[in-house]
């Protein structure tokens, strides 16, 4: 099974924000995607490391598509998410990659119980790394329905 047209080996999943969740999933075995690592990073840490991650030829990228709504506008200016999305868009363009976007509303499918069931759980931080893992899980399930059987918990 091939996950996408780029024949990627890895999936880089990003939940952008002031604290950004990032994870890398190994897709070599389509029936058993494996979390390589997950982390929660600051904006500066993201700036320092994202180019090296996105530029890897065998890596596909998925990111949460953050939208400014009336409600988010009331909470804060929140430029970080949009700025980070723009940076990732540019780096993907520069690397000749298609960037996949996911809505925040897609995350609830990948609840904590499902993340733990397939060892996609991150310990520590404020939950942003787990949100990146949620986007990774949704991306994998959208492309491999067989893997969904493992999620029936």
What are these regions (language model features)?
Residues 1-153:
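Phosphate- and other anionic-substrate recognition elements at nucleic-acid/protein interfaces
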């Amino acid at each position: 099974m091939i996950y996408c047209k780029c024949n990627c080996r890895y999936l880089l999943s990003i939940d952008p924000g002031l604290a950004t969740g990032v994870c890398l999933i190994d897709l070599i075995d389509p029936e058993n995607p494996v979390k390589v690592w997950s982390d929660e990073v600051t904006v500066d840490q993201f700036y320092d490391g994202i180019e090296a991650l996105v530029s890897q030829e065998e890596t596909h990228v998925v990111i949460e598509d953050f939208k400014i709504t009336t409600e988010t506008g009331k909470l804060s200016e929140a430029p970080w998410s949009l700025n980070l999305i723009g940076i990732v868009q540019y780096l993907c363009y520069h690397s000749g990659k298609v960037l996949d976007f996911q809505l925040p509303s897609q995350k609830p499918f990948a609840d904590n119980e499902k993340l733990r069931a397939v060892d996609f759980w991150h310990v520590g931080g404020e939950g942003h790394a787990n949100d990146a893992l949620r986007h990774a899980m949704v991306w994998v399930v959208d492309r491999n329905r067989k893997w969904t059987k493992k999620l029936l918990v």
